[in-house]
Amino acid sequence: MSKRQTGMTLIELMIVVVVLGIIIAIGVPSYRGYIIRANRVDGTSALLRLAANQERFYMQNNIYASNAQLAAALPAGLGIAATDHGYYNLTIAAAGAGLAVGYTATATAVAGESQGSDADCWTYTINEMGLRTAATQGAADNTGVCWQ
């Protein structure tokens, strides 16, 4: 009479470990890319909100708000201290002829945060005309990809 052995062999266990390693090696970068693309909304939505608040500010004051008025509560400012999740820094620059004529608002990814590794959509901009642009970390235009 022979005894039947039950359980797993070392080879079977190693095969399972290798398969899990392959799944993790493929899955983690894909998930990371998904999170980066999803977090881009933090910058774009903040800029669109800022642009709407700029128009409201302009209607009341006949001049666009400056960078110093970014965080001040309405109606003295725009009421936007930062993006909702803090992945982007917001700044406002006057147009060539000054804030009475126009502005350019910029959202730049915060280094060290999750968006700090987003090389494809590092900065977003919008101006008083609604013109949207986006650039990579190397300052190459990537508007078509980033403002989808």
Question: What residue spans do the PLM features occupy?
Answer:
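N-terminal single-pass transmembrane signal-anchor helix
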Residues: 2-34
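Residues at secondary-structure transition points
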Residues: 5, 37-41, 45, 98, ...
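Conserved catalytic core of two-component sensor histidine kinases
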Residues: 17, 44, 51
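Alpha-helix exit/C-cap motif
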Residues: 37-41, 49-69
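Outer-envelope exported proteins of Gram-negative bacteria
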Residues: 46-49, 108
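Periplasmic/extracellular, small/polar-rich flexible segments of pilin-like filament-forming proteins
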Residues: 59-148
